[in-house]
């Protein structure tokens, strides 16, 4: 039975790179230490902008680059016998998910995609990728504006979580919280794009643990997020695999 989606209960930081440093005590001679710099969500936006302006590359093409890296990783782990169920949100995380859907479908996978457009407002890049999906043969695509029924899934399926990324600034509630609960209760493997939906990228103060996706695999864009280093968040992340999409090294060093 369908229900209304909205009423469903349900300092300086930067990149990971190898750098030889003078050996402190208790390290082996010639040992290479790793210096990890971690970006805030604002700094990530600035790095994206810097890459777009200085490479130069369009934001749509940069999103396509991320989607290709993610799709390649998924194809390396699962055969075309696997069904992917993709949940895309209205922002750029959702745009990534829609682009991944298209690439998987074109590679011969069965893909069932849901775009949650509750407010009627999509980011520009999400809208562009929606348009590229609409006439794609073989893709099961549903745009959700109010009514939603969670699909039947089994342990052989893979759910791709592309609902919300690092731009999230408040806990998920209503239909989105209910959707996350259904994802977490499902027998399918769960892969999150960039960060598990519902998890704040920098601060645990406002996390609602019952409304955060518990991923088996997190394919994070370019760099680990600050929240990944908090012990209490490990249960949401699963395996973390950074996807190098060629963001500007010059911008990272700035």
Region roles according to the model:
Residues 34-80, 249-254:
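Positively charged, low-complexity intrinsically disordered leader regions
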Residues 6-8, 17:
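Short hydrophobic targeting helices and cationic amphipathic motifs
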């Amino acid at each position: 039975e369908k229900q209304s989606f909205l009423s469903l209960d349900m300092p300086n930081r930067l990149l990971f790179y190898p750098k030889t440093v003078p050996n402190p005590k208790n390290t082996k001679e010639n040992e290479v230490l790793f210096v990890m710099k971690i970006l805030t969500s604002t700094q990530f936006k600035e790095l994206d902008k810097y890459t777009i302006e200085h490479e130069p590359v369009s934001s749509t093409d940069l999103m396509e680059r991320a989607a290709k890296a993610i799709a390649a990783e998924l194809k390396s782990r699962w055969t075309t016998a696997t069904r992917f169920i993709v949940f895309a949100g209205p922002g750029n995380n959702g745009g990534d998910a829609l682009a991944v859907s298209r690439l998987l479908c074109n590679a011969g996978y069965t893909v069932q995609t849901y775009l949650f457009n509750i407010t009627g407002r999509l980011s520009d890049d999400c809208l562009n990728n929606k348009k590229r999906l609409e006439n794609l043969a073989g893709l099961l695509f549903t745009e959700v504006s109010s009514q939603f029924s969670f699909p039947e899934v089994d342990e052989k399926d893979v759910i791709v979580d592309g609902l919300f990324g690092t731009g999230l600034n408040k806990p998920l509630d209503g239909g989105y919280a209910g959707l996350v609960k259904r994802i977490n209760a499902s027998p399918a493997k769960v892969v999150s794009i960039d960060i598990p939906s519902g998890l704040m990228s920098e601060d645990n103060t406002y996390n609602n643990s019952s409304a955060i996706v518990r991923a088996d695999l997190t394919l994070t864009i370019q760099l680990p997020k600050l929240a990944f280093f908090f012990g209490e968040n490990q249960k949401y992340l699963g395996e973390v695999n950074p996807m190098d999409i060629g963001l500007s090294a010059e911008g990272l060093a700035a």
